[in-house]
Structures are given as C-alpha cells and as structure tokens.
Curated annotation (Swiss-Prot):
NCBIfam families cross-referenced by the UniProt entry: PRK00114.1
BP GO terms, sorted: protein refolding
Keywords: Chaperone, Cytoplasm, Disulfide bond, Redox-active center, Zinc
Pfam family, one: HSP33
Signal peptide residues on this chain, from the entry's feature table: none
Disulfide links within the chain: 236-238, 269-272
HAMAP family: HslO (MF_00117)
Official protein name in the record: 33 kDa chaperonin
Lineage: Bacteria, Pseudomonadati, Thermodesulfobacteriota, Desulfuromonadia, Desulfuromonadales
GO CC field: cytoplasm
Amino acid sequence: MKDHLVRVATQDGTLRATAAVTTELVDAICRRQGTDPTASVALGRLVTGTALMGSLLKGDQRLALMIEGNGPVKKLHAETDALGQVRGSVKEPISGIAPTETGFDVPAAIGRAGFLHVVKDLGLKEPYRGMVQLYSSEVAEDLAYYLTSSEQVPSTVALGVYLEKDGRISAAGGLLVQALPEGEEALIALLEERLVALPPITTLLRDGKGPRQIIEELFAGIPLGRNEETPLVFRCTCSRSQVLGMLKTLGEEELKDMAAKDEQTSVVCEFCKERYSFSSDEIKALIA
C-alpha cells in the first residue's frame, strides 16, 4: 500500500478527519537517520503526526513540528508542505532505550520534561509560532493537547509505528479527528465512542485496511462532504545553493578561518544526510 492520506469532513460541518498510512515514509526517514528501534518509533510518530496536521495546509504553506525533551534523543524535528512532501530528523538517533514486553518506552526516549514547538509558514510576513509543554511525551497526546489548548480545536490523535523483531518498520500510520465549532453534540459523542473502540492504527494497517477503510469504518452511517486524497513522500528541500547561502550568514572572521585551512569545508544536511563540500576558493568568494 503506497503512503497517502485521506481527508474528510461531515456534510453538516461538525467534524473533520484525516487518516494516513506512512510506512514507507517513516522507514525512509529512519534509515537515513540511523535510528535504533525506540528512536524509530518516536520519530515515526512525529513524522506521521506532521503529515496529518499538514493535511490542513494550502498552496505554498509549510508546517514544522519540533519536540525537545530531556531524554536521550534530545530533539525530534519533522516538516511538511501542502503537497504531502515530508522530511524528518532526530538529534541523537541512538536512544539506548530497549523495547519492553509491552512495546516501546517513547516517553523515556523523549524525556518527561520538554516542549512541543509548532511553526507554520502561512505566507504572511512572519511565521506563526506556537509552543506547549509536553503532555505525556507519547507524541499523539502531545499533538492533541496542542491542537485543543493552543488552536482551540478539540482533537483526537492516534499514531502508530510497528517494528518487526529485526527492526524493520512494517506498518506506520495515524488518525486525526477534530470537532468544529457549533458541532452537533450527539454526533461528537458517537465518534468518541467509536474512537475508544477502534483498534490500534497499526493493527488496522496490518489487517490490510487503508486510510479510506479506516475513515469509512469510523464514520459509518454519517454523511460525508469533502473527501480528498493526497500521496505522501519523503522529500528534502536542501540544495548546494541553499547551503552556500547558509554559510554566507556566518561572520567574516569565521569564513576567513575556514578559507585559510586550504581544505574542503563539508556540511551534512540534518534531514537527508546529503554531504555538500566546498573548496577554500568557494569559501573565499562568500567573503564580502
């Protein structure tokens, strides 16, 4: 099943929801980052949550989510655009947190204390920036807490990453359900009951159900209006010219020191791990 998301809204405007399968996306990002199993689950959850929240973007808008905690992975970062092009990174890919009999201790990897940062480029003069303390460090609950408390949209988020015994990611996906203003309380209550009874996302995906089937099961008997599908892919926006521009922002003295070493300067993209190398002459050309 190719990675994609399905976004729907009820005809009466009471609810909207997005379901996604992100298995290939999460696997591609975690392989590039070299994550251990627990870090893979933590990063995979944030990548999936970013894709879900990105379904609300339009045009050239972009979204970035960052989790900074006092755990061994230190920082998780994921970005997306309205086209479903996603990338992600982790500061320390080896969490050292072994899987337990019941699963993965993601809060131990992230840390119990920390913050969720949200940055939205909506095409305005300045990006929108939001921040909340981590609610549980499970990622899904942290995103739901942010959406409900900061954006004032009651939200439920479910995220899952399933690893085989050999560490291979065999299923990843998520679900975002939001209640809109002046929604019908009875309908919201019905959805809440169904969400409680819904099996884990990875169980549904491993049973062969895709985002559309998950949505149809959740909203059975409820008239739907808008219904959109978007492919999800890993894509990094870095480039050689972009890195040169970043180097140019360094101070003149620092650039002179780099150029004087008469050896190549290398910069590695934190997301895709592409290495960009520049000669001392190229560094000298950056000095005004």
